[in-house]
Curated annotation (Swiss-Prot):
It comes from Arabidopsis thaliana (Mouse-ear cress). Keywords: Coiled coil, DNA-binding, Homeobox, Nucleus, Transcription, Transcription regulation. The lineage of its organism: Eukaryota, Viridiplantae, Streptophyta, Embryophyta, Tracheophyta. Belongs to the HD-ZIP homeobox family. Class IV subfamily. Expressed in flowers. Residues 88-147 bind DNA. Residues 229-466 form the START domain. It is found in: Nucleus. GO terms for molecular function: DNA binding; DNA-binding transcription factor activity; DNA-binding transcription factor activity, RNA polymerase II-specific; lipid binding. GO terms for cellular component: nucleus. This is Homeobox-leucine zipper protein HDG4. The keyword Coiled coil applies. CDD domains: homeodomain (cd00086), START_ArGLABRA2_like (cd08875). Its main location: nucleus. Probable transcription factor.
Amino acid sequence: METKDKKEKGHMVLNSDNVFGSVSSSPTTTIQNPNYFTSFENPNFPYIFPKEEYEVMSKIESGSGKSTGSGHDPVENTAIEQEPPAAKKKRYHRHTASQIQQMEALFKENAHPDTKTRLRLSKKLGLSPIQVKFWFQNKRTQIKAQQSRSDNAKLKAENETLKTESQNIQSNFQCLFCSTCGHNLRLENARLRQELDRLRSIVSMRNPSPSQEITPETNKNNNDNMLIAEEEKAIDMELAVSCARELAKMCDINEPLWNKKRLDNESVCLNEEEYKKMFLWPLMNDDDRFRREASRANAVIMLNCITLVKAFLDADKWSEMFFPIVSSAKTAQIISSGASGPSGTLLLMFAELQVVSPLVPTREAYFLRYVEQNAEEGKWMVVDFPIDRIKPASATTTDQYRRKPSGCIIQAMRNGYSQVTWVEHVEVEEKHVQDEVVREFVESGVAFGAERWLSVLKRQCERMASLMATNITDLGVIPSVEARKNLMKLSQRMVKTFCLNIINSHGQAPTKDTVKIVSRKVCGGLVPCAVSVTLLPYSHQQVFDLLRDNQRLSQLEILFMGSSFQEVAHIANGSHLGNSISLLRINVESNSSHNVELMLQETCTDNSGSLLVYSTVDPVAVQLAMNGEDPSEIPLLPVGFSVVPVNPSDGVEGSSVSSPSCLLTVAIQVLGSNVTTERLDLSTVSVINHRICATVNRITSALVNDVGN
């Protein structure tokens, strides 16, 4: 037995004789090595041992070194003696290829089998459930480790590729070279600027006359180089955020920052002392040459806030929406674009602001425009602030006009409308307006105030709603929605041209009750334009009601010269009856179907003033526009009237005019035939002057008669 045990891999085999002693031993027989199990008081056997061996070892350990072969349990001793030698049991079981194959097949279908599945598989393979469980656990660990090693290898390869690409890009940047300019483009630009300045100085020395006229276009071109440098953009963003906070406070705070006017107790005026205490801005530009204008107003408009915000960020859309105020606008530079929308956008813009009267000078300025969204409150903020905190004012403005933090806060409403709070805050150098009434009107802040901006915005939003509507009545002549849109676009171009003819006429502005005649070149000759401004002691609504009555105008021979007319198309532009577009057929009795004269008419009014504009149009061109053709090429010669109230309902304390008054501007154009010279002859000037004076006299007489009756 000993020889056989020694051959068994050189291991010592334990049996009942050499471990527990003989069965016939005396109960008092002591174990020769009583401390044999002492070193295994807390055995840490691996779980790979079979369950039967683990139980036997547990029993041995619980005996605390005493012999279990005492003879008191012969059945137990007999079982132990009959048990095969422990060394013959395989402690590590290697699965067969068939077992592994079947377990791998199940692993592909289900890597996490439940207890029943493992029990069924163990019976099928002749393994214990714990062996099956551990095999699946080890297999999952092995697969996870393989995937981890594979992913690490891929990441290392990708990292090496990125490092190589980065090194190549850096080396390419170091080798960049412009073949066109040879790295001398900035030097060349600096040299050209110096040359331009030198030429300007030469021209100014040769033409020192102070009366030399500089057109607005020239000034705009001179300011094109006033762009924001890269190192100044961070400062601009900080200023934008600060100005947005200032605008928010000016919109929210009432007294003592804003005091109610004593005349109507509704309009408010800015308390300059409180403003200086609350904000540091005026302390940095405290110049006595500048007069400050500040106003605030609220209104609900028929437009959603997103569309309105996008219009503020597009110079063309902005000038089109506010064309009675903004005669021209452009975006000079995009300093910052919003990350995910308009919010955070910062623009450098230029604008020329106007009142539709040649007696009121225009205002031009470069300024920064910033847009910010408060998503929690559903608000958008559009704030303008001057650029001259970074650059000198003389280099950025042409008429010493600065827009202090101004703009609007737009609150979205559930019905798609928007609640707009507008603040207009500017600094203007004193202008010498010849007429005292007009000077008081401008200095009151009403001419360019917040109420005028909101009045124009409300009317333009109603016009846009009419443009998009499909249920507007048009007397049944306009065949389609597209035809109505084309007619409205043609009419809008007519009104804008009329306003530009009044504002952009060169030379000194006319005085009150005088006629100014200018001309402009067109293909084939000159078009004389006569402008007259008259102060009427009547409210602008009275004058507007008279002028929009075409029957009265025909009787007074003001516009139609006594001719009969018929309205063939009518488009309502808003809730007010005075906001409409009409297509009139002139000389109905004498016209045949082959000889039709048409006149396009648009009238618009709000609290800030009224416009009545007319122009004859070619019937063939109108028909093409009705059929969907582009109306932008149809020639127009607009004539009409502009009525501006010089003392609005809120009034101005200390005004020299106590009764309602308004400025009536009459502008007419005549297409001169076969006029090829650059100057108008005296006969043409005399005819135009007589016609416009007669028109003003008839209007004045009609108003006197209406008041007398």
